[in-house]
Regions:
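N-terminal beta-strand motif that seeds the catalytic metal site of vicinal oxygen chelate
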Residues: 1-16, 64, 112-122
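Vicinal oxygen chelate
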Residues: 15, 64-107
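Conserved beta-strand in the GNAT
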Residues: 48-51, 99, 108-111
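Short acidic/glycine-enriched loop/turn segments that link adjacent beta-strands
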Residues: 35-37, 58-60, 92-96
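A short acidic/small-residue loop/turn micro-motif
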Residues: 56, 93, 113-117
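Core segments of cupin and vicinal oxygen chelate
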Residues: 2, 9-48
Length: 122
């Protein structure tokens, strides 16, 4: 039985820039370095692996969604770090969320489950 995704691995053109971006969002570097070809960052139970691919050009679209406790707190922290997320949206499926694109074109979404949706899932 599958329980959950343990990590997402993303190609990056420049490791220092990518590590800076993810640490600005609250991730902690747990393996690797700005000079490494592969690094891992963690926030809660979520792991993001970065693999160096200097000539990387996204040829497809995808989105990684992170569940957060408070979407407004993270949104405000991202803005305070100089990042430019889209405005917080209210999804009809019971989440508040915002999207943000990393320096390599990967779309990230940060979503907070609203109480009524949490009751349906619980």
């Amino acid at each position: 039985m599958i329980h959950h995704i343990s990590a997402v691995t993303l190609a990056v053109r420049a490791m220092p820039e990518a590590i800076t971006f993810y640490t600005q969002l609250g991730f902690t570097l747990v393996c690797g370095s700005p000079q490494a070809r592969f690094s891992t960052l963690q926030a809660g139970d979520a792991l993001v692996n970065l693999t160096l691919a200097p000539n990387f050009k996204p040829a497809w679209w995808g989105r990684t969604i992170f569940r957060v406790d408070n979407v407004e707190t993270l949104y405000n922290a991202a803005v305070a770090q100089g990042l430019t997320p889209c405005a917080i949206q209210h999804g009809s499926w019971g989440e508040r969320y915002f999207h943000l694109t990393d320096p390599n074109g990967h779309e990230l979404s940060f979503a907070q489950l609203l109480p009524q949706a949490a009751q349906r899932q619980g």
